[in-house]
Amino acid sequence: MADHQALSAVFFLLLVPHVAWMAMAMPSSTLLHDKCELYAAGDRPSYDYCIRTLRVDSASAAADERGLAAMAIRIARSTAVATAAKIARLQRGETVPARRDGLAACAAEYAAAVRRLGRAARDVSRSRGAAGARELREAQTLLAEVTGAPELCDVAFEVAGGQGSPLDAADRELDVVVGLASDILPTRPMATTKP
């Protein structure tokens, strides 16, 4: 009987931290699901994309609204960096002048997108208290500017010779992840907590 009580006590002690951790993680996990439901607006593939994209960062389960937006922006920045690297590889091998011009225009757009997304992530991370509204507006503006980068890249290829962009899939991916970041971006700064 004493062994059974001791075993029960050990089980209880092991269970308490797990239950406490679950209670702390649940609201943020719910926030992740709530934000993805709003983003998807009833479209299951969009919801799955949102969850899959944000869960790439293991901190997403415990993140607040601002943290989720910053994660989405960092993921968008990584997408833009990868596309910029692809553009650089294509530029090295391109011999047709019109396509080189198109790639040069795309390189400029994606370099600007990388800078803007970096600034947007910093703005969201700093958006606390009364001054935070300005940072959130700036982040929204930067995300809106980045949303146009893929289309400008496509237009550059059309102008350069009427050929389609070799970056269509990458362009669509950037627009989708920037759209996700825009949709989950908080509209108001978080209140600052006093120590």
Say what each PLM segment does.
Residues 2-140, 145-195:
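Trafficking entry modules
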